[in-house]
């Protein structure tokens, strides 16, 4: 496969520049016959999760296609689902550059992007043009300048705008790069948010005559007590699924490596065991009452199987996709 050569060229560039260049090319081919250049035939292995039928258990994690610009091209590579976003009510530039760093030896990434996106209205227009035949998840967040105490308003605005177009909606309360965001994972703040989201979901179901499931994306840095509390809240509020996990602030496995001290969330192989352990504990707490979408450091068939053995129904990739390319999709779907 050509990807090792492509990767070598891309890794000569600054990580964000490499991402922009890649997306520039994908935008050119998305929705055109040139999509055949990236199309891969993968086996159909249907999985039911959150009341939806996924054509295979592998999805693209949020953060790669923040604005839904390359849905068809990414879909052609064989993903059973794509999670686009994180998107916010209003466009925002994100944090200052540089804000994305490779840890090449560890096959990890550190990012402090800060929800850079062109806003929810732009994303919806892109979704309307797409023809992806898999499940499309839309990941939503709050604007940086929205006070945390008003954060739920941003989630409700986004829900209202994406509901008609989403296969499922992911609630991102676990990015480490928006000040105060992770506080929404705890106690009364989480209960208030989930109550508002569930009420909005019920209202939107009545308006649109369809039920769009909602999943909450959590951090890997929860202590035991916090994990138990989160699991309890998700069950009490009848949330449809949980995505575990986002990036970590823990640097214990990358000490001494180039870029290891950069501020931001660490993803990729160094996150693998930590996220799998969270999935295992979460699975014990949830007792099969709520499905888990497993994400964090999946870079091989074995790593994907470990997530499923720990309790995940579906899995997602991001950093592994950057390091291994489209062949990883075919490999995982074929052998999982």
Curated annotation (Swiss-Prot):
* Disulfide cross-links: none
The alphabetized list of GO BP terms reads: 'de novo' pyrimidine nucleobase biosynthetic process; 'de novo' UMP biosynthetic process; pyrimidine ribonucleotide biosynthetic process
Relay the cofactor remark from the entry.
Binds 1 FMN per subunit.
Q: Does the keyword Ribosomal protein apply?
A: no
InterPro entries for the chain: Aldolase_TIM, DHO_dehydrogenase, Dihydroorotate_DH_1_2, Dihydroorotate_DH_2, Dihydroorotate_DH_cat, Dihydroorotate_DH_CS
Query: What cofactor does this chain's UniProt record say it requires?
Result: FMN
Q: Which SUPFAM superfamilies match?
A: FMN-linked oxidoreductases
A Pfam family reported for this protein in Swiss-Prot or TrEMBL: DHO_dh
> Mind listing the UniProt keywords for this protein, alphabetically?
Cell membrane, Flavoprotein, FMN, Membrane, Oxidoreductase, Pyrimidine biosynthesis
Positions binding FMN in this chain are: 62-66, 86, 139, 172, 217, 245, 268, 297, 318-319
Any single GO CC term annotated in Swiss-Prot or TrEMBL for this entry: cytoplasm
Q: Where does substrate bind?
A: 66, 111-115, 172, 177, 246-247
Where's it found, cell-wise?
Cell membrane
Q: In which pathway does it act?
A: Pyrimidine metabolism; UMP biosynthesis via de novo pathway; orotate from (S)-dihydroorotate (quinone route): step 1/1
The catalytic residues are: 175
GO MF, one example = dihydroorotate dehydrogenase activity
EC number(s) from the headed UniProt entry? 1.3.5.2
Reaction(s) the record says it catalyses: (S)-dihydroorotate + a quinone = orotate + a quinol
PANTHER family of this UniProt entry?
A: DIHYDROOROTATE DEHYDROGENASE (QUINONE), MITOCHONDRIAL, DIHYDROOROTATE DEHYDROGENASE (QUINONE), MITOCHONDRIAL-RELATED
Outline what the protein does: Catalyzes the conversion of dihydroorotate to orotate with quinone as electron acceptor.
Similarity comment text for this entry: Belongs to the dihydroorotate dehydrogenase family. Type 2 subfamily.
Subunit structure, interactors included: Monomer.
Protein name from the UniProt record: Dihydroorotate dehydrogenase (quinone)
Q: What is the lineage of its organism?
A: Bacteria, Pseudomonadati, Pseudomonadota, Gammaproteobacteria, Enterobacterales
Question: What would be the name of the gene that encodes this protein?
Answer: pyrD
